[in-house]
Amino acid sequence: MDHFEYKQGELYCEDVAIVELAEKYGTPLFVYSRATLERHWHAFDSALAGHDHLVCYAVKANSNLAVLNLLARLGSGFDIVSGGELQRVLQAGGRASSIVFSGVGKQANEIEAALDVDIHCFNVESEQELYRINEIAGSMGKTARISFRVNPDVDAKTHPYISTGLKENKFGVAFADAESVYRQASKLEHIDIIGMDCHIGSQLTELSPYIDALDRLLALIEKLRAQGIDINHLDLGGGLGIRYRDEEPPLPAEWASALHERLASFDGTIAVSYTHLTLP
């Protein structure tokens, strides 16, 4: 439930008329519902109860400091894609230990800043980025915790412009190359491999793509563990859809229920990133 509704043709947020807020504060005006944010965050958190987990808010969705502060007080993790987002999360009270650094094109100064505050991990997009992080960590006398973004080559059945998990999409390490890249990373002095990450797309209205991607990742994790490369952090990205017209996207509880059976044998932390919390 979103706490926005129409009453006699007027839009209300948490029983407050938007027109009254506009008259009081002027326009343009952005109105966020605290009750909606809290409800949606708790929906994911509760759905994953029983398994060690970290619910991460994708800061690119809305980096308003008040929104970030609310989520920090809930105990949320944060998925960032820039040094600026890192600073905003910290300024808003977020814990560095709950931050994962995703995204392509991480700059050297951004990597340094993230290492300096000891974030949870980097979601590494490529072999080249891996070597860059190793070099920077070494120059700082630190070890970088990393998770590779693996492209599982799964059709998310969403709009092609927001699909990110197919082989032809330009994100992450190709599934066919992932095992080799993990082996290379395991030899680097300033790298600590902790996890595996994937993001298959946005506005997902079916669960089957998630399940297909998870099955592929779990099979890869078993191969790596047999080689002494332990994966204890699994980051499942991709946005559950919202209703624009007649879509019926799965609820977080339905999503989690579908995953639990497959995750029963995984003894690490499950991280999930979400971006749709602020949408009315």
Predicted features, each with a name:
Residues 1-144, 183, 187-192, 219-229:
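A charged N-terminal "starter" segment
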Residues 58, 145-151, 197-199, 235-237:
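Short beta-strand segments
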Residues 117-124, 164-175, 204-210:
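Flexible, glycine/proline-enriched loop segments at strand-loop-helix junctions
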Residues 129-188:
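Conserved anion-binding
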Residues 200-201, 234-241, 273-274:
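Glycine-rich beta-strand-to-loop/alpha-helix junction loops that act as flexible
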Residues 206-212, 243-255:
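Short glycine/threonine-rich loop-to-helix capping motif typified by GTGT followed
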Residues 258-263:
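Alpha-helix-loop-beta-strand connector modules within alpha/beta enzyme cores
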Residues 275-280:
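Conserved small/polar residues in nucleotide/adenosyl-binding loops
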